């Protein structure tokens, strides 16, 4: 069974978010998602300064099995990207909730947080797959 940290929020499309001290949110994919995808070989990230919209694809995770779009859980401006993934995409596999994060977004509509799932709700999504 996948690890689902209780302090994070989740999208049903398997992205997670974590609030940072500056008000931005770090975005990554869940341990469950990386297990389904398998070994990462390439990650395409948005650019700092890009505007992203909740529910729209803004990054790509490519593994030995498939390429998968990564969707923005929140609308806002991309304020940081994880450049370490450029040379080490396998960080997504080894530390999905830590060093394997994708990007940070400064949200423009905090009400969108209400559309995200807690750990229990996300577990229910996985169980229904």
UniProtKB/Swiss-Prot annotation:
Residues 24-106 form the Lipoyl-binding domain. The gene is gcvH. One of its GO terms (biological process) is glycine decarboxylation via glycine cleavage system. PANTHER family: GLYCINE CLEAVAGE SYSTEM H PROTEIN, GLYCINE CLEAVAGE SYSTEM H PROTEIN-RELATED. The modification N6-lipoyllysine is found at residue 65. CDD domains: GCS_H. Belongs to the GcvH family. InterPro entries: 2-oxoA_DH_lipoyl-BS (IPR003016), Biotin_lipoyl (IPR000089), GCV_H (IPR002930), GCV_H/Fam206 (IPR033753), GCV_H_sub (IPR017453), Single_hybrid_motif (IPR011053). The keyword rRNA processing does not apply. GO terms for cellular component: cytosol; glycine cleavage complex. Gene3D superfamilies: 2.40.50.100. This is Glycine cleavage system H protein.
């Amino acid at each position: 069974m996948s690890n689902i940290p209780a302090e994070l929020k989740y999208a049903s499309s398997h992205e997670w978010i974590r609030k940072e001290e500056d008000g931005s949110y770090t975005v990554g994919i869940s341990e469950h998602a990386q297990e389904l995808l398998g070994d990462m070989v390439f990650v395409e990230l948005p650019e700092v300064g890009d505007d992203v919209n909740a529910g729209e694809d803004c990054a790509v995770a490519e593994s030995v099995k498939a390429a998968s779009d990564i969707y923005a859980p929140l609308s806002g401006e991309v304020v940081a990207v994880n450049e370490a993934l450029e040379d080490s995409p396998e960080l997504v596999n080894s530390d999905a909730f830590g060093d394997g994060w994708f990007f940070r977004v400064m949200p423009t509509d905090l009400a969108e947080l209400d559309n995200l799932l807690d750990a229990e709700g996300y577990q229910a999504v996985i169980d229904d797959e």
